[in-house]
Amino acid sequence: VPANWPRSRSEHFKTLLKARAIETECYVLGINCVGVHDDTYYSGDTMAINPFGEVIKCVSNIQDLLVVNISNDVAEYREKLNTNKDRRPDLYKKFLY
């Protein structure tokens, strides 16, 4: 997720990234600006988050390269949580038109 969040909203950026990871059950990478541009301060907060919303690695206040290892445990987690069984395609048609 490329971003341009100022330092004053850093916590919003981090919270939204964690929420995206949890709701999609996917790894999420958030890449944010760092430094100063036009009198606006950016804290970076570039981070990798696992599908449980846990921060794997984060880089703040410096320009850096983030390298992370990810596991394939997500497939096993998705099987256990199987939200697809809750789908109701029979109801979708009445909401499409």
For the regions a language model picked out, list residue spans one by one.
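Active-site beta-loop-alpha substructure in enzyme catalytic cores
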Residues: 1-24, 28-30
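C-terminal beta-strand edge segments of enzyme domains
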Residues: 33-97
